[in-house]
């Protein structure tokens, strides 16, 4: 048996034998073409399936912490800033602390409100409701006050000989501090907190104040001026007739913002110096004495500070939906309009059909009258033909012609005639014997000629069988009649 099939397959687990080498080669090729997923390949590297399914996407987001950042990024940043403030509070007294807040309000005796937003920023997004701003009576402890600065991201820096503030990214937040009199020097706070700006994309950016320099006054505010800022994407608070903010118009803050406000209030009360600061997410109010000057970096398109701005009312987005609902709720009215349109179209169609039918009737009447007229003409012509036939038959046996035939036997032979063959045969002119030669008129002569011609034509048919003898008879009366 082994001699019949000497070629053995050397594949593991296969001991088949073949009679020739070609069969063995084909068999080995089958082994090569077979995919092997058995335990022999368990020691190899297994590639993990990373198809981006929704479940895996959500799992990755939870592992990275994206949902936590979306939910509590604002609260997390403020907690971090509050912890840093508490750690540095024990180091030394503070003249003014600036936590990482988008807006800071400082109040003194006489309020002056300054707008720090462009005039064309509408209040349309009700997503982030502003907080009710609280005003705390300041307790100045130190003599030196920091130099007044108003930071407007995206605005022009101060060119006054000192390092400008660093935030230049466009953001709807602004930091405004109090402006002291122009003769004051900036005192470097010994234990001041770092100023952290919270940007719109969820990141924080530290802001370092510049060295102490003498700041000249740029804008002198002689009287209190009030304006309401309009920050893009945040609804502005309502403004009364005097331009001040009405606290009753603010919506109820969220739970996270309430906790943040409580934390900041506790921090302000723990510090025995500086001034009260309350975060207002929608507006920024700067108060100062009327005699004090203030340096303001403001948007170049900002309006004059003497005109208060009132935030426009939010448009109601449910107008189209309400219209659709009213249409859906009134199917009878919709059917009524549909029937009215159908009736109007049917009336127009009837009017067009009437005009078409009337034009056809008018054309038919015209053709009928024309047909009647033509039929009348045909009848008249037929009557005239009948009368002519009767006249011809009546003159066939004229008595004058018969008398001439009896007396003279008139016939003209075509051979002896000087006229060519086929010409009219003899012309017989009749004349009345009783009428005088000069008494015939032209009409009577014409009638006589016509009568003679008709008589000749009738006599030619009756006398063709007779012997051909032609004689021309001219009466003397005819010559006188011809004259």
From Swiss-Prot:
Residues 334-354 are annotated as: Basic motif. Changing residue 22 to K: No effect on binding adenovirus 2 E1A. Abolishes ATF7-mediated E1A responsiveness. Residues 360-388 are annotated as: Leucine-zipper. Changing residue 107 to R: Abolishes sumoylation. Exclusive nucleoplasmic location. Increase in binding the E-selectin promoter. Gene3D superfamilies: 1.20.5.170, Classic Zinc Finger. The modification Phosphoserine is found at residues 413, 423. PANTHER family: CYCLIC-AMP RESPONSE ELEMENT BINDING PROTEIN. Belongs to the bZIP family. This is Cyclic AMP-dependent transcription factor ATF-7.
């Amino acid at each position: 048996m082994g001699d019949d099939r000497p070629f053995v397959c050397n594949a593991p687990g296969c001991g088949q034998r073949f009679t020739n080498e070609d069969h063995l080669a084909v068999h080995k090729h089958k082994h090569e073409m077979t995919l092997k997923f058995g335990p022999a390949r368990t020691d190899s590297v297994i590639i993990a399936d990373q198809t981006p399914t929704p479940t895996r996407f959500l799992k990755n987001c939870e592992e990275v912490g994206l949902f936590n950042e979306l939910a509590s990024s604002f609260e997390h940043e403020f907690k971090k800033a509050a912890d840093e403030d508490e750690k540095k509070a024990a180091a030394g007294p503070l003249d003014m602390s600036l936590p990482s807040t988008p807006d800071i309000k400082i109040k003194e005796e006489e309020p002056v409100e300054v707008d720090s937003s462009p005039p064309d920023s509408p209040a349309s997004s009700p997503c982030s409701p502003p907080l009710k701003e609280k005003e705390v009576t300041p307790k100045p402890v130190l003599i030196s006050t920091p130099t007044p600065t108003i930071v407007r991201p995206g605005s022009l820096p101060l060119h006054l000989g000192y390092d400008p503030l660093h935030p230049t990214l466009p953001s709807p937040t602004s930091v405004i501090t109090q402006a002291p009199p122009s003769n004051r020097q900036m005192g470097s706070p010994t234990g001041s907190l770092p100023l952290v700006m919270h940007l719109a994309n969820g990141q924080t950016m530290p802001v370092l104040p510049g060295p102490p320099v003498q700041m000249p006054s740029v804008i002198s505010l002689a009287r209190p001026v009030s304006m309401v800022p309009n920050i893009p994407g945040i609804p502005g608070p309502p403004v009364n007739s005097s331009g001040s903010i009405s606290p009753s118009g603010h919506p109820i803050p969220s739970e996270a913002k309430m906790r943040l406000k409580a934390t900041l209030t506790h921090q302000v009360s723990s510090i025995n110096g500086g001034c009260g600061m309350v975060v207002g997410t929608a507006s920024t109010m700067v108060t100062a004495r009327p005699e004090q000057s203030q340096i303001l970096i403001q948007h170049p398109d900002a309006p004059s500070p003497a005109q208060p701005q009132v935030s426009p009312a939010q448009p109601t987005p449910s107008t189209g939906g309400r219209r659709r609902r009213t249409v859906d709720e009134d199917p009878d009215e919709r059917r009524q309009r549909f029937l009215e349109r159908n009736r109007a179209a049917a009336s127009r169609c009837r009017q067009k059909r009437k005009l078409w039918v009337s034009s056809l009737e008018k054309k038919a009447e015209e053709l009928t009258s024309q047909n009647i007229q033509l039929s009348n003409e045909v009848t008249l012509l037929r009557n005239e033909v009948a009368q002519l036939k009767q006249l011809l038959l009546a003159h066939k046996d004229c008595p004058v012609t018969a008398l001439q035939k009896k007396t003279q036997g008139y016939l003209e032979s075509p051979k002896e005639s000087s006229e060519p063959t086929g010409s009219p045969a003899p012309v017989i002119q009749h004349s009345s014997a009783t009428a005088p030669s000069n008494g015939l008129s032209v009409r009577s002569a014409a009638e006589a000629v016509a009568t003679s011609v008709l008589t000749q034509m009738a006599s030619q048919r009756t006398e063709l069988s007779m012997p051909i003898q032609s004689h021309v008879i001219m009466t003397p009366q005819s010559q006188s009649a011809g004259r």
